[in-house]
């Protein structure tokens, strides 16, 4: 679920298990806000039929954002490779009565015929895929109708990864590989542009917009514990035995780093707000 780079099985006793439920609590309203910000870049839907593909649908953030914009004359196919995630997505379809169907598919090898969809969205997806998501983009383009629209995004700035790195540097020996090292390449919109062009879209048909995404989180200590649990052990080094004794120091370092990020705001009800920035690409076939 959290894409570890190491085969080590050790985990600190304090670490929360990386389940879809934990992921859902971590992202809170963040994925919905990212999807909504991304969809705002394509304008309103007209009255014609919309056939939307939510690629790597996860728990349904993209689907929720789509249905908030268009209720009628729309069909949504949500695809993901993870069975546990798809089960929750199906529950969300039933609960929210989305006009959607959940299907298990590899984003890099879709089973849909050519020119199936009018729109597709890959929400917070590319940077977790092999080959930087190029193969998935090729499949998205293949399955789009001529004139169809693909919406893709990546984080231009995230407050969470630097906070994780601060904790790792404070509690681990110098030279220990950092979790999610290399993600910073996605902060450059030219990298995202290059990936999309490698996926087959013509350069003049790819437009970019940068969006601020304000995410509400609960108790800061709880949030820091969750993201350190979810990401802290994902480097090539995995979890270290010393991480168990240094657990509180690491979590406190995450808390401190988060409060110092641009856009951080403490709310009155015990909640907090942190700010992400996203590159949103709108590509037309």
Question: Whereabouts are the PLM-identified features?
Answer:
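C-terminal helical/coil "lid" or tail adjacent to the Rossmann-like core of SAM-dependent
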Residues: 4-13, 18-22, 205-268
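Conserved alpha-helix/loop element of class I SAM-dependent methyltransferases that forms part
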Residues: 28-50, 64-68
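Class I SAM-dependent methyltransferase SAM/SAH-binding core
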Residues: 50-110, 135
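A short acidic, Gly/Pro-enriched loop at the edge of an enzyme's catalytic core
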Residues: 108-120
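A short SAM/SAH-binding and catalytic strip from SAM-dependent methyltransferases
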Residues: 118-132
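Conserved catalytic/acceptor-binding region of the Class I
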Residues: 134, 141, 146-219
